[in-house]
Regions:
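An edge-strand/N-cap motif at the start of beta-rich repeat modules
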Residues: 87-103, 110-111, 115-117
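The serine-hydrolase catalytic nucleophile loop
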Residues: 472-487, 501, 642-643
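Peripheral, non-catalytic segments that deliver or gate enzyme domains
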Residues: 100-106, 112, 124-129, 145-152, ...
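A fold-wide structural signal in alpha/beta-hydrolase
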Residues: 490-500, 659
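N-terminal propeptides
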Residues: 1-87
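Beta-propeller domains
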Residues: 119-144
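Active-site-proximal cap/loop segments of hydrolase catalytic domains
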Residues: 501-693
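Short beta-strand element of the alpha/beta-hydrolase
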Residues: 462-472
Length: 693
């Protein structure tokens, strides 16, 4: 009787009898075999797993025996999978709010003694700082009261609680102090139009830290010693105008700096703060030598370097400039390492291929890492050591994946106990989310382009609407992991393509420099070639392709609909560049030391005028015919609001209707929760109206 019922459904006949109960695993076996036309038998557990991935059991109870009511749901889910029609049928539609609201407690950090933790959590719709004593039943105490803007980051200095915050997205971050009861918040750097960064926590020095601040000259950062009780600053190092970064030794003495003429850098060194800086490592064009810090004895320097090689490696220099390679990878750049000053040793390093991988240099630390990994039952690429106390006995770790937003845990190695601290996006069910698949394809000139393809659940990977999502930068990269906007799009039935086009970081010097002066040209070709690859696989419907990106991704969006106007049926430009000339004229003052490098990588406004004119979409708006939605923060210090204004005005002058959203209290991408939710709701409606007709 049960088989007869399924046979009727498979043949498309009306179901005549649903009165017979059927076990979940048996239903999984019959339906999966019918849907996939499988000939070979598998285990019942395998069928259940496939059925879950297909979404056949969505919205069902956990009972092993399926009722008549549940049978109807299963068959409807299976019918939707079989037909592959509609708005991602068989998958529960998850609201924009659930993807884009504040996900919960984030940014956990241990106090230096390991007895307290801080984290950021929502209060009055803004992320604020909370503190909690460990191994204690007391409630967390809110110690900040920001109602206009999320706290950017918080950190400890001995028993001092500090946090960073800007105003309206202007990225002029100030350092604030607060107390354990939150009654005394104070801006320690209350100077107009400055931005501050922390250089050293000055271990062993009470109530003082080293900061970098552009107080004297907006274009460059000097070094100051900041008293956390009084707010008094003492000038430690004056920037002559070409220093891009400073490095303090383990005692807090500023003994190293990186200078640049805008293209070529030089690492400078001095024996003490009384001495003059002298060249230590001379770089050539394309070289990167980024000092990470001094070793315990202050006689060696760890650095990330690609000097004399294609890939970034982690090296150790002695004070004579002799180099020892600590970690390298033949395929990709080394992302970073964890150095422990107590052991005077690099414990492990990370590199990113399709996912994040680790190379260990300390046997005890690897055993600890594997123990935590096994306790949590996760893959290596899903586990991160976030923070630890001085003795490295207490740890904050986090777990995330493509379908898991994230979880924080506290691990005490002295008791071997692990405690869950928070689940991000606890209202999201990983089984309802889409997997992120690493992919690669060849560009038209033979480069291997790596990327990711996320496919909607319960939909056959055939003739799907596709959203192309180029990353920002462009000197950045996409990585495997949880991405709320990608999951939102996949949940609504879209395939999402992300690619690391030439000029992306992580793949070596040659790959990055292949994108020099290629905005709108070979970089854009890499994006177009990725779209064509997905079409050739039969996955994407060539008539239902949209493109959406932020920052440089916004530029790539505008370039896509300008230079390949027949490829895209809808486009969303989020804080994107439309005019390269005005971009270069309005960079933040503290980016001035890198101006020549921008000319090298993007183009010179005078020497490359023809190139930049051809590559700026605003001058070719007459080619644009794709429906466009533009979103912009009014206070954006990186991509000025004028970038959006220009393209909107140019298109409207031709009578083209362009949707536009501007938020006066935002900067480079929207940070405030209500603005994020409004933006993504509007974007979805816009995309659906053009790609789901």
């Amino acid at each position: 009787m049960r088989q007869q019922i399924i046979d009727q459904w498979v043949k498309g006949e009306e179901l005549k009898d649903l009165s017979v109960h059927i076990k979940r695993d048996e239903a999984a076996r019959i339906l999966v075999r019918a849907l996939n036309k499988e000939e070979k038998e598998a285990t019942l557990a395998d069928y259940q797993e496939k059925a879950n991935k297909l979404g056949l059991f969505n919205s069902l109870s956990a009972s092993e025996t399926i009722s008549k009511q549940d049978a109807v749901k299963i068959l409807n889910n299976a019918k939707n999978v079989k037909n592959g029609v509609g708005n991602n049928e068989g998958v529960k539609e998850i609201s924009v709010e659930d993807f884009m609201k504040n996900p919960g407690n984030v940014g956990y950090e241990l106090s230096p003694d390991g007895n307290y933790i801080t984290f950021n959590a929502a209060w009055e719709n803004r992320r604020n700082v909370f503190v909690k004593k460990m191994n204690d039943d007391s409630e967390p105490v809110r110690v900040s009261s920001s109602t206009d803007r999320d706290i950017y980051a918080s950190f400890w200095k001995d028993d001092n609680l500090l946090y960073l915050k800007d105003k309206g997205g202007d990225e002029n971050y100030h350092i604030y102090s607060t107390t354990f009861n939150g009654n005394e918040e104070k801006d320690l750097t209350p100077y107009p139009n400055v931005t501050v960064g922390v250089l050293s926590s000055l271990q062993g020095v009470k109530d003082e830290i080293l900061i970098m601040m552009n107080k004297e000259d907006a274009k460059v950062f000097d070094v100051y010693k900041l008293n956390l009780k009084t707010g008094e600053t003492t000038h430690v190092a004056k920037n002559p105008g070409n220093i891009t970064s400073w490095i303090a030794d383990r005692d807090g003495n500023v003994r190293m700096a990186v200078a640049s003429d805008g293209v070529v850098g030089t690492v400078l060194y001095r024996d003490s703060e009384k001495d003059e800086f002298k060249p230590f490592i001379e770089m050539e064009s394309g070289d990167q030598v980024m000092p990470l810090g001094f070793t315990k004895d202050n006689k060696h320097i760890l650095a990330k370097s690609n000097k004399g090689r294609d890939k970034v490696e982690v090296v150790k220099y002695d004070l004579e400039g002799n180099e020892e390679v600590i970690m390298s990878n033949s395929e990709v750049d080394v992302a970073g390492v964890l150095y422990n000053s107590e052991k005077d040793k690099v414990l492990y390093g990370a590199y990113v291929t399709d996912k994040t991988h680790y190379q260990f240099f300390d046997e005890d630390f690897e055993k600890l890492f594997r123990k935590i990994q096994n306790k949590l039952g996760v893959r290596e690429s899903e586990l991160v050591i976030n923070d630890y106390n001085k003795e490295m006995t207490k740890f904050i770790v986090s777990v995330s994946s493509d379908t898991v937003f994230g979880k924080y845990y506290y691990y005490d190695s002295t008791t071997d106990e692990i405690t869950e601290l928070a689940t991000l996006g606890s209202w999201l069910n990983p089984e309802e989310l889409a997997e992120m698949h690493p992919i690669s394809y060849k560009s038209r000139d033979g480069l291997t382009i790596n990327g990711y393809l996320t496919l909607p659940k319960n939909k056959e990977a055939k003739n799907l609407p596709l959203i192309v999502n180029p990353h920002g930068g462009p000197w950045a990269r996409d990585m495997w992991g949880f991405n709320p906007e990608v999951q939102l799009l996949a949940n609504r039935g879209y395939a999402v393509l992300q690619m690391n086009f030439r000029s992306s970081t992580g793949y070596g010097k040659e790959f990055l420099e292949a994108g020099n002066k290629q905005w709108g040209l070979k970089i854009q070709d890499d994006i177009t070639d990725g779209v064509q690859w997905v079409i050739d696989q039969g996955i994407a419907d060539p008539k239902r392709i949209g493109i959406y990106g932020a920052s440089f991704g916004g530029y790539a969006t505008l370039a896509g609909i300008t230079y390949t106007p027949d490829l895209y049926a809808a486009a969303v430009d989020y804080v994107g560049i439309s005019n390269i000339f005005t971009l270069l004229n309005t960079i933040p003052p503290y980016w001035e030391t890198a101006r020549k490098q921008y000319y090298e990588r993007i183009g010179h406004p005078e020497n490359d005028k023809e190139l930049l004119t051809a590559a700026s979409p605003v001058f070719h708006a007459d080619k644009i015919k794709t429906p466009l939605f533009v979103a912009q923060g009014a206070n954006d210090p990186r991509v000025n609001k004028a970038e959006s204004d220009q393209i909107v005005e140019a298109l409207r002058a031709r009578g083209v209707d362009v949707e536009c959203m501007v938020k006066d209290n935002e900067g480079h991408v929207f940070q405030n929760e209500e603005n994020r939710i409004e933006f993504y709701n509007t974007m979805l409606k816009f995309l659906d109206s053009h790609l789901k007709k």
